[in-house]
Amino acid sequence: MSAVSRNRRCFSGEKQQDEVIKMGKYFGTDGFRGEANENLTADHAYKVGRFLGWYYGELKRRNGDDTPARIIIGKETRRSSYMFEYTLVGGLVASGADAYLLHVTTTPSVAYVARVDEFDCGIMISASHNPYFDNGIKLINGNGEKMDEETISLVEAYLDGNLEVFGQKWEEIPFAKKEKIGCTVDYVSGRNRYIGYLISLGVYSFRGVKVALDCANGSSWNIAKAVFDALGAKTYVINAQPDGTNINNNAGSTHIGGLQKYVVENGMDVGFAYDGDADRCLCVDEKGNVITGDHILYIYGKYMKERGKLLTNTVVTTVMSNFGLYKAFDELGIDYAKTAVGDKYVYEYMMKNGCRIGGEQSGHIIFSKYASTGDGILTSLKIMEVMMARKKKLSELAEGFTVYPQVLTNVRVTDKKAAQDDADVQAAVKKVTEELGDTGRILVRESGTEPVVRVMVEAESEEVCQKYVDMVVNVIKENGYVAG
């Protein structure tokens, strides 16, 4: 089944699943993630550094360049981030690479610096919206894009002790010696230039606008306010006191209730909530309503269409976008594409087809003219741009998009592929599709990171959604796939 479907009109019989993306043993859809020193250990980080430092240096040597590999590193505010930073750096310099440290910063800033300053690759130490005791390693190529699967497969092979590359097997890769041992460079200036870049994208002054920012006690805590202050906003910040254990704790884009309350009680014009590494953004309008990634795609897609700037007349979404978004796009005469879940796949489609905007319901929004990955702070600037250009409140800009009720159930299973492909499950899904017709849709898909099958229905009422979700979930249970 293709990872992308492209549509113009509202649809009947939505494809039941996105393409099952090949997952590695360690790396999932968004890096190597797990509980610190449980699933993801300091030893893993050291070995990732060892491989990347050697591999990119070897690539350069084979192209006649004897200079060391240059690798840029950023991290979140988790307690374990320092441990992983030190062990990654140890591996990199032991293999002869130079490690450049942005210190606490956002994932999109690492992507920006990797691209602009021509690094061989970038590493972000982040578990995004996960709790503090988790962490992760995100790999970014020299173009500021998420790392290709071929390179990731080599990293995994090295972790498992069966690396084969450059025409031979490597039981161990060589250590650098003497003057070939790598250097460690403080590179906070790179983060500061990223802040300057964001400020330069401000089309309008935000003078007099009361903006609330929820930084999730994460990596945007000392970046977002600097940007909004420079553009003239009256900036108010919550959850910007990271202590190593409070990242995403009842804060940020996955716990947006606090920001909703703050906006209403303090008369804010708008609020923006980021996740731990600030690659996603959700908004709160002046009435306290949540503005999701789907709303953002609607608002900015419409804005670009009205200005004649929507190249290919297409907004790129994932299969998890709300049914109502496509109805709204039909009303506007905007085409849309649907990819597998993951901003990586949204970006790949955008690059291949020349699209300017795409993203996910969760708030990963990509503006391909300005960035190579989702960027939460950039997203908030673009929403501010539309508000200022149209001289409208955010609640007014969201009018025209009606969110369909949605029920999503995560079923923990013993074998997610077998459960999803089961003939009885497929028959139940087909029956639901036929009964919903063009009044809703069902989507059944495997999680990319957990032993979970997700069953989601969107329809005109929550009762209808629940009825059809239960129908499919019960078949999964009756056929013996539920774990524990």
What are these regions (language model features)?
Residues 153-195, 200, 286-359, 366-367:
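Proline/glycine-rich low-complexity loops and linkers
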Residues 146-148, 237, 289-308, 376-385:
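Gly/Ser/Thr-rich active-site loops/lids in small-molecule metabolic enzymes
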Residues 19-90, 94-95, 184-211, 417-421:
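An N-terminal, well-structured beta->alpha segment
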